[in-house]
A protein has these predicted regions:
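Outer-membrane beta-barrel translocator/receptor signature
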Residues: 96, 110, 123, 132-135, ...
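Solvent-exposed loop segments that connect transmembrane elements
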Residues: 211-218, 256-285, 332-339, 382-455, ...
């Protein structure tokens, strides 16, 4: 199987038309040159004074051709090609987990910010979107809080669309692939005159997927989505420019194809009657009695204004973002009918940013700015306790009541037997047998417990305000100092309304009672946070555009409130009350109880101090670019996503006291053979460990996670790509004058590798280092390109995500497998 798939890649390189020539000799006059992306794809930056590789930070950039070569359809597929960056493909479009430099989050406050055409994407549930019509992607590593505010502690990603002022015409792209991948994209760019230009684009994408739900045979990762966007650029004068944009996307998919992760020890210990008997160790196929699914509408709109003054630029960006989604999740991930969740989100976000930047040739380059945003988010998230869960709860409370009665009766009987001369051991055994017989004779003990769905309505408004300044001062012709400071204020609140109802049917000693237990929680909580986010850097410029730098900065992620764990709180509370209930009971909650709830659901802001040194080197007369950086981060109150409470009905954010992250990053980009060969290698080493973090466990004990690796963070990332263009001799063509004659063929391969990744705080479950190989061959027919591509050429088996759950009363580990071998073809037409 491996040889046959490797053969596909070799055929891509070998199956070239006659007359193709490739001169592999390196001539003395090789004209190869690697350019900074700022020199090729020019974007007006409203805040920065210098190009990316001239700033005191580590960064990675991709142009449109590089994104096409890597076949990037969303930002998750840049994982490993950016050092220390991982955004795993799992769950659904709802999932937006990004990990960079040892920090990240599966829920609530993100660690990496995203901007699209200068507009911030502020809704976490909208981070994972279809990428198309993109001309450039920048990834800035490390805290970017001074200029970009909270939730950019790990870094920042900026995406830029093609400008209709620079690019005109119509593009149509059609793709087919295994797993019945199908996709159509169409874009039109038109420059009406020197002052006005616009673009329109739309897409449809779908895939039947690779995994089936063993419960019903349905496709567990089916997806269909479509969308459209438009952009209008208007420059009424030489000083004033307007940029209006809107982007809508709709997604409907089956999601969360998690299968049980089974170890070799579990299989070896399984009896022949166990469902584990005879299985192969590893992650099994999904087997859920309900097919989890997700639907989402997102609309992002922005209005940018730029005024060019005498020696300064003023930029304004106003945005409105809308989210409306629906999620059904089988949260026990089992074929049994225990639990499921239905969640609906309805959100609106308004934001405004105003910045003023110097534009002159002086030694002082300055930026001032202010940012404000307000988010309204309403979430309805009822949790349904299904028949197997109610059966489990009924057995639990029945066993509790039966054993309590049995032990009480047996103690009294045993005392009499011991007084009559019987040994203690014999008396206790005889007493328990006699007590059990008496219980059975008088009607026994049986309690049926039915827990109604737990509704939950949560409103979580958020207000954020920031004011900032950054100066870059040329101390000498070679040395520049960077000084920045931001004041950031955030106000967070939660209004929650939730309740629980448990109906009991108690049959004890022939007496039947039917108590009903209810509990209601309704409260408003709020908090606010202030932070100063400084930045200090030094950049020393070397010849040929190279430089070395050092920087010190502070990172910040906002605090807030959990709400996914209320069903766990209410279930625990009502189950405890049910053990003593003899009549209807409405559980009362006093002020002290609500204060304890507030402490339970809140999580604190995360802060970090980042120390970094690095260099940007232009080597071999700009045939090679080498970027190196080393960093150390001291993290306080690191935010972690864990499963809630006793049963793990939802994910919650908690804080680890202290942790640290350190690492190395390297990126090498080069060109050779008169730019016919382009290659890139990136590597990231991350060591992220807890310094202070303890957690309570059942029975009142604690567990210490000191020196454990922070979960979900890959210790190594490795990305590599190489593309070789083979030009076609026109003399070898039948009709070289044809508009569609073959110009060149580009063959390439790429590799993305990550690991080791721990999936839990105790570091008991992990994914070893793995590598995924890709290949492509692109034929250039002028207006038409045909690209044959392969992903996961060697069909590597790996997990992209794993989670532990005790929703069924026993702790299991569930994981999602990475996509297997996939073959596809793209047709791109420009006219």
């Amino acid at each position: 199987m491996f040889k046959s798939r490797l053969g596909i890649a070799l055929l891509m390189a070998a199956a070239l038309p006659a007359g193709v020539h490739a001169d592999n000799t390196i001539e003395k006059g090789d004209t190869s040159r690697v350019y900074d992306i700022d020199e090729v794809v020019i974007i007006d930056q409203p805040k920065e004074a210098f190009r990316l590789r001239q700033q005191p930070l580590s960064s990675t950039s991709f142009n449109g051709a590089q994104l096409q070569s890597l076949n990037v359809q969303d930002v998750r597929q840049l994982s490993a090609f950016v050092p220390s960056f991982a955004m795993p493909e799992y769950g659904s479009r709802y999932t937006s987990s990004i990990y960079m430099r040892g920090i990240g989050s599966r829920v609530y406050s993100p660690a990496v910010g995203i901007y699209v055409d200068g507009m911030p994407v502020l809704c976490r549930s909208a981070f994972n979107f279809h990428v198309y019509d993109v001309d450039r992607v920048d990834v800035l590593h490390g805290p970017q809080g001074t200029l970009y505010g909270m939730n950019t502690e790990g870094g920042l990603m900026r995406l830029y669309s093609r400008s209709p002022f620079q690019y005109q015409g119509t593009d149509v792209k059609f793709s087919l692939g295994t797993g019945f991948l199908r996709k159509v994209e169409a874009s039109h760019y038109e420059r009406l005159n020197d002052r006005t230009a616009f673009s329109l684009a739309g897409f449809y994408g779908g895939q039947n997927g690779f995994f089936r739900n063993q419960f019903d045979g349905g496709r567990a990762d089916l997806i269909n989505e479509f969308g459209g966007k438009g952009r209008l650029l208007w420059h009424p004068t030489g000083r004033l420019a307007f940029d209006f944009m809107a982007d809508y996307q709709y997604t409907r998919q089956n999601g969360f194809p998690y299968g049980q992760l089974v170890t070799e020890d579990e299989i070896a210990a399984a009896p022949i009657t166990s469902p584990l008997y005879g299985l192969k160790a590893g992650t099994q196929s999904p087997d859920q009695n309900r097919q989890s699914n997700y639907r989402r509408n997102i609309l992002n709109t922005g209005a940018g204004i730029k005024y060019t003054g005498n020696g300064f630029d003023v930029n304004s960006m106003t945005s409105w973002q809308y989210l409306h989604d629906y999620m059904l999740m089988d949260i026990d991930y089992r074929p049994q009918d225990f639990l499921h969740l239905i969640q609906r989100q309805h959100g609106n976000i308004l934001s405004e940013e105003l910045s003023v930047k110097s534009r002159n040739g002086s030694r002082w380059h300055w930026t001032f700015g202010a940012f404000g945003s307000y988010q309204w988010l309403k979430t309805s998230a009822p949790v349904y306790f299904d028949k197997d869960m109610n059966a489990f709860l009924s057995k639990t409370i029945t066993d509790y009541a039966y054993n309590g009665i049995l032990n009480s009766m047996a103690r009294g009987i045993a005392q009499g037997m011991i007084a009559g001369g019987m040994s203690k051991e014999a008396a206790e055994a005889a007493a328990r047998a006699l007590a059990a017989a008496n219980i059975a004779r008088t009607g026994g003990v049986n309690i049926d417990m039915a827990m109604d769905p737990v509704p939950g309505l949560f409103r979580t408004p958020t207000f954020n305000l920031g004011v900032y300044h950054e100066s870059n001062i040329d101390l000498t012709p070679h040395l520049t100092a960077t000084l920045g400071l931001r004041y950031d204020y955030s106000h967070v609140a939660i209004d929650y309304e939730t309740s629980a109802r448990v109906a009991l049917q108690e049959h004890v000693f022939g007496v039947n009672i039917s108590p009903v237990i209810t509990s209601r929680l309704n409260r408003h909580e709020y908090d606010h946070f202030n932070q100063l986010l400084p930045k200090v850097g030094l950049t020393y410029r070397l010849p040929d555009g190279s430089n070395v730098y050092a920087t010190w900065s502070k990172g910040y992620r906002a605090g807030g409130y959990n709400f996914e764990m209320f069903s766990d709180v209410l279930q625990t509370e009502t189950s405890k009350a049910a053990k003593a209930a003899r009549a209807d009971l409405d559980i009362a909650h006093d002020e002290a109880y609500y204060e304890r709830i507030a402490k339970t659901i809140e999580y604190k802001p995360e802060t970090s101090w980042n120390y970094e040194a690095g260099t940007h080197l232009n080597l071999l007369d700009n045939q090679l670019h080498l970027d190196l950086s080393a960093y150390y981060m001291q993290i306080r109150n690191q935010q972690l996503s864990v499963m809630a409470g006793n049963y793990g009905f939802g994910r919650v954010m908690t804080n680890a006291g202290r942790s640290h992250s350190c690492g190395l990053e390297a990126t090498l980009r080069g060109g050779a053979l008169d730019n016919r060969l382009a290659y890139a290698i990136s590597y990231g080493l991350t060591s992220a460990r807890f310094d202070e973090y303890t957690d309570s466990v059942a029975g009142g004990g604690t567990i210490d996670y000191k020196d454990k690796q922070v979960p979900f963070v890959p210790q190594h990332t490795l990305g590599a790509s190489a593309d070789y263009r083979i030009d076609v001799d026109p003399a070898a063509l039948l009709d070289p004058s044809s508009r569609f004659h073959l110009r060149s063929v580009t063959v390439g391969m790429n590799l993305s590798a990550l690991g080791k990744i721990y999936w839990d705080e105790q570091n008991t479950v992990s994914q070893n280092f793995y590598a995924v190989l890709g290949a492509h061959a692109d034929a250039d027919f002028g207006p038409l390109h045909i690209n044959l591509w392969v992903r996961n050429l060697t069909d590597t088996k790996y997990d992209t995500f794993a989670v532990q759950s005790a929703a069924t009363g026993k702790r299991y580990t569930f994981a999602q497998q990475g996509n297997p071998f996939q073959l596809g073809v793209d047709f791109r037409l420009h006219f």
